[in-house]
Amino acid sequence: MPKASHHDLRFAFRELLASGSCYHTASVFDPMSARIAADLGFEVGILGGSVASLQVLAAPDFALITLSEFVEQATRIGRVAQLPVLADADHGYGNALNVMRTVIELERAGVAGLTIEDTLLPAQFGRKSTDLISVEEGVGKIRAALEARVDSALAIIARTNAGVLTTEEIIVRTQSYQKAGADGICMVGVKDFDQLEQIAEHLSVPLMLVTYANPNLRDDERLARLGVRVVVDGHAAYFAAIKATYDCLRLQRGLQHKSDSLNATELSHTYTQPEDYIRWAKEYMSVEE
């Protein structure tokens, strides 16, 4: 069977965005998971920033991974992927000029699209970890990303955190990013269909939601009617892999009968030690949670 080129996969993702359906992403974190996802018929995968941080650094999602480390993992996936893979490019690893470099490197890695978010990352001295950059700076980043891409089929998706904004503020931000030329709008933290409907009526570009399996947003037909084309439920496959590794090694050591077995969430918490990072951020940066 002939292999699809990176451009072919980008075109396939463009067709997905132009369709009238809603698709759920496979969590893709290495070449093997990319092959499995494609073989199982997933239409699109995503390399999450949080998952990349876990896979590469065994660190929590505190913007610790570097662009080069993230691109290396995306490149490994891009060598074998036969489904469109989106890259969660966080804040673009810096200012608008850094965003341009991010787009250049991830395009070469073979991703079909990438999200650039407007969270103030990495966490800044004396600021809240959920603070956002200004709309003007966010617009500049999207315009810079569009300028940097070579293959026009590469999708540039603007992402914002609906969980820390009023609905009116979300509309202002997303309309601004749409006007700047974003190929799609990604939102995390949308509460329910009522809020989504209020936002969607002001937008014409395809929408992407990070829902973490929010039970209030479980209706693919309704999502599709509102323009949602991509849904990220989370990264269950990655955490299942962590759990399977833990259980297998416990069995190998003869510890399977002990009562202190951990679930996937507990394992992630135990082995990334987020309390240390939170304490350091408070002590050295006066960062508020």
Curated annotation (Swiss-Prot):
Residues annotated to bind Mg(2+): D88
What would be an example GO MF term here? methylisocitrate lyase activity
Q: What is the annotated quaternary arrangement, including any partners?
A: Homotetramer; dimer of dimers.
So what family is this one in?
Answer: Belongs to the isocitrate lyase/PEP mutase superfamily. Oxaloacetate decarboxylase family.
As its record notes, the protein acts as a catalyst of: oxaloacetate + H(+) = pyruvate + CO2
Q: Which InterPro entries match?
A: ICL/PEPM, Oxaloacetate_deCOase_bac, Pyrv/PenolPyrv_kinase-like_dom, Pyrv_kinase-like_dom_sf
| Keyword list, A-Z | Decarboxylase, Lyase, Magnesium, Metal-binding
Q: Name one GO biological process term.
A: propionate catabolic process, 2-methylcitrate cycle
Q: What is this protein called?
A: Oxaloacetate decarboxylase
Entries under CDD domains matching the protein: ICL_PEPM (cd00377)
What PANTHER family does this protein's entry cite? OXALOACETATE DECARBOXYLASE (PTHR42905:SF3), PHOSPHOENOLPYRUVATE CARBOXYLASE (PTHR42905)
Presence of keyword Amino-acid biosynthesis: no
State how the cofactor is bound: Binds 1 Mg(2+) ion per subunit.
Q: Which domain of life is it from?
A: Bacteria
This molecule's function is given as: Catalyzes the decarboxylation of oxaloacetate into pyruvate. Seems to play a role in maintaining cellular concentrations of bicarbonate and pyruvate.
Q: What is its EC number?
A: 4.1.1.112
* Cofactor(s) essential for the protein: Mg(2+)
- Residue numbers binding substrate: S50, R159, H235
